[in-house]
Amino acid sequence: MNQYEKEKVEIAKFVISKMWDCNESQFTLMKKRNTNIVMARRFFIYYLWKHCEVKHNRMKDYIHGMNHATSIYHCRKFEQEMEFYKDILKKWITFLYYADQREYQKLKIDMKYPIETINNIDFNSNYIY
């Protein structure tokens, strides 16, 4: 992983910790199962897999104690949640807006998410799960 990608991961950790009100160490260690920590971990795993191209069997380098099967489960579960729960989709779009502008711009171009959904998000409000 080059320096740019390392910085992307650090920014993502910071944004996730602010969004889900937890410490970076709480979601990078497989110790707690509180809802906000699990959701923060799920965001981080999905971001690493989808946008940083980290393989499932290498997730253990970023989240201590992570098994590849757990990583696969979290990615599939997160995709299902984005499809069924609009608040999770809004949080994901908000996360990309603050963490990675390149991916946010790609998301706006991608036809999977309508522009109306992206434009109607109030980025100043706090989304609470």
How would you label these PLM feature ranges?
Residues 1-3:
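Solvent-exposed, charged helical/coil patches
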Residues 8, 12, 40-41:
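N-terminal positioning helix adjacent to the helix-turn-helix/winged-helix DNA-binding module
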Residues 13, 55-57:
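Helix-turn-helix DNA-binding elements, focusing on the entry/boundary residues of the two helices
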Residues 18-41, 66:
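Short, Lys/Arg-enriched anionic-surface-contact patches
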Residues 28, 52, 70:
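Ser/Thr-centric signal marking residues that sit
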Residues 38-54:
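Short, amphipathic alpha-helical "recognition" segments used to contact nucleic acids or chromatin
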Residues 66, 77-129:
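Intrinsically disordered, low-complexity basic tails/linkers immediately adjacent to helix-turn-helix/homeobox/MYB/SANT
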